[in-house]
Amino acid sequence: MGLEYHCPICGLSVSEMKDYDRKRGRNNCQCWKCGSLERHRFTYLFLQMYLGFFKDKRKNILHIAPEKCLYEVFKDYRLYVTANIFENRITKELFDITAIPHKDSCFDLIYCSHVLEHVDDDIQALREFKRTLKPGGRGRGHIVLDLPVRKDLDVTYEDFSLQTAEERKKAFGQEDHVRAYGKDIIDRIRSAGLTVENYYPSELFTPAEMKYYGLTDERLFLCR
């Protein structure tokens, strides 16, 4: 069997990827070497091929809830802030993203993947991203968001009266989620004062390329 899959982050080529979560049908999707999943590989390719982000390391990055595979990509940039609400080996700062302790207009890139669905006031978090992002012009910054969006929901569903893990899992699909995003996600992001575009892997890559890189058709949101 040939080397059918390639991780663009670490460069590993293999005949089959690692299973991640068999209970949810997440088979053949994780890189054996760097641990990347489909969304991480798409983010890397999007930054590389469509934003040209890796051409200059004199940039400031805010990475929320950092993933190890992308930490290795960003760690040598001029300023690289990794942030979370709990400590781990690759987190530099502990803070609530609804009150980011950094000055206005300081980041070239803010990357936040699968975090906002855990945050009570996601709109305020988006406002903080906008505040700390470098403004328009040639050197303008970018916010890259990755969010789980349910195709069966027209309107985002949240209910803060649900407090137990069991209630939240039933309502939102995961014990620590506080909402399920729906088809109104673009309007929700815009309500924080941001412009937003969304990009699907299938719009940017051929089916053969998507298979080669191990991608699913989960979109990214590019905001400013």
What are these regions (language model features)?
Residues 5, 120-224:
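S-adenosyl-L-methionine-dependent methyltransferase catalytic module, highlighting the catalytic core
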Residues 59, 106, 137-141:
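Surface-exposed loop/turn positions
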